[in-house]
A protein has these predicted regions:
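Non-catalytic accessory/interaction domains
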Residues: 1-85, 89-93, 105-107, 112
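Long, helix-rich interaction regions
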Residues: 75-85, 92-190
Length: 190
């Protein structure tokens, strides 16, 4: 593996440097970025850079500035890819109300799936209420399958009837059926 070191003379240290803005090179450049550089990157870089910064900011989750920035990115970034990464990083710091607002506003299925998963981890009772309310309304098979899976983790036997009604629902790759069968065996104690 070949390593190259390049040095550039500058008047002041840049917040972050983008060597390959279009991600065309078959080389990975590792940069140690400060908190301020990551916050700047998550706001201003391209989609891949913003996603990477959102992921890397999880190391600074104790900083209030990081929490504010990631919460805003998790709901308002124009790319679902970046919103999803921010949700994964900030999940432990979000309230059940934050999750509910993010779920209602979210148009793309992958971040909604992450919202269901993270909310179930950190706010199980509120997640259970939300899942029971929205499982029949969500138009994504991926999200419905995640909701069914979470019912197996945080639900109870009263959810069995609801899950059985979804078991025979058509979905690509039978993801809802597979999720329902695993959840039913969990709740029924098999």
């Amino acid at each position: 593996r070949k390593r190259s070191i390049h040095r550039f003379e500058m008047n002041k240290e840049p917040l972050f440097v983008r060597f390959d803005p279009e991600n065309d090179l078959l080389i990975e450049v590792n940069q140690k970025l400060s908190l301020n550089a990551l916050i700047n990157k998550v706001k201003r870089d391209n989609v891949i850079g913003r996603m990477e910064a959102a992921t890397e900011l999880s190391a600074y989750i104790d900083d209030p500035k990081t929490v504010r920035t990631l919460k805003r990115i998790a709901v308002h970034d124009k790319s679902w890819f970046v919103r999803n990464a921010a949700l994964k990083s900030i999940g432990s710091e979000m309230s059940s109300k934050d999750f509910l607002i993010a779920y209602i506003r979210e148009k793309h299925s992958q971040p909604r799936k992450t919202i269901i998963s993270k909310m179930s981890n950190y706010h199980a009772n509120d997640a259970l209420k939300m899942i029971r309310k929205y499982i029949d309304r969500d138009d994504s098979y991926v999200v419905q399958a995640e909701m069914i899976k979470q019912l197996g983790n945080i639900g109870d036997k009263s959810d069995i009837k609801k899950i059985k009604s979804h078991r025979d629902q058509w979905s690509p790759r039978k993801i809802i059926r597979n999720s329902a069968e695993k959840t039913l065996s969990k709740l029924q104690g098999n």
